[in-house]
């Protein structure tokens, strides 16, 4: 998990919304994900990214909704995912968005 955290950054992310009911039994991984993304080190990678914790008392399924700056959306249902799986998926989407964004910029290195 430490390796996934070392490279985690929010540069292409516009908003992260984490929704869960704290009284359900399957929210630990979602809460761990929220704690990781809310850390000062990760938040400092993009000060314009808003991290929203939506805590409800309605028995709803834990959910993470990530909105990227290019309009791409990642929705993870946290009931049956571990924190590591959520962080790994999040990091891979961030790398994909970074690669897509850098390819659109003029003068970007094409590797030729």
Swiss-Prot record:
Keyword Ribonucleoprotein: yes or no? Answer: yes
Which Pfam family, an example, fits this chain?
A: MRP_L53
Domain of life here? Eukaryota
Keywords noted in UniProt = Mitochondrion, Ribonucleoprotein, Ribosomal protein, Transit peptide
Q: Name one GO biological process term.
A: mitochondrial translation
Quick one: a GO cellular component term? mitochondrial inner membrane
Q: What is its main location?
A: mitochondrion
- Subcellular compartments: Mitochondrion
Assembly, in brief, is:
Component of the mitochondrial large ribosomal subunit (mt-LSU). Mature mammalian 55S mitochondrial ribosomes consist of a small (28S) and a large (39S) subunit. The 28S small subunit contains a 12S ribosomal RNA (12S mt-rRNA) and 30 different proteins. The 39S large subunit contains a 16S rRNA (16S mt-rRNA), a copy of mitochondrial valine transfer RNA (mt-tRNA(Val)), which plays an integral structural role, and 52 different proteins. mL53 is located at the L7/L12 stalk.
Similarity field: Belongs to the mitochondrion-specific ribosomal protein mL53 family.
- Family matches, as PANTHER family: 39S RIBOSOMAL PROTEIN L53, MITOCHONDRIAL (PTHR33618), LARGE RIBOSOMAL SUBUNIT PROTEIN ML53 (PTHR33618:SF1)
> By what name is this protein known?
Large ribosomal subunit protein mL53
Record organism? Homo sapiens (Human)
